[in-house]
Amino acid sequence: MAKATQAVECFHSGFNCAQAVFSTYSEEFGLDKETALKLSCGLGAGMGRLGHVCGAVSGAYLVIGLKYGQFQPNDKEEKEKTYAMVQEFSKRFEERNGTTICRDLLGVDLLQDDKVFTAERIKEVCPKMVQDATEIIEELLF
């Protein structure tokens, strides 16, 4: 199954956007799926429904960190590689969607706007964000 399809199915099964993207790749990098789902849970809906950076984007940043992230204090090269990949991911995501900001992608304030309308916008918009994030990860990392 294609990674984008897998991630979108994960989202439709009840997990948030960040969980869907991050957990799709976690086991490839030695992190079990349960831990990945727990770690990324608070990042959904733009950081806990705050509408900040899109959770699919945050999930992708975590995947980039698993592949390239610095784990030695003096390894500046890995840190710079990670930052460069995050910047390139963001550029490509913005080219597709205009922004990486959740509330702008959805066109709603997740904490203030009508809950029924917000839920409909999430169903309409977020699967595409999950798919786009996953496709960009595939382009950049594999």
Predicted feature descriptions by range:
Residues 24-42, 104-109:
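Acidic-glycine-rich active-site phosphate/pyrophosphate-binding loop
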Residues 1-29:
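Active-site-proximal helix-loop elements at catalytic-domain edges
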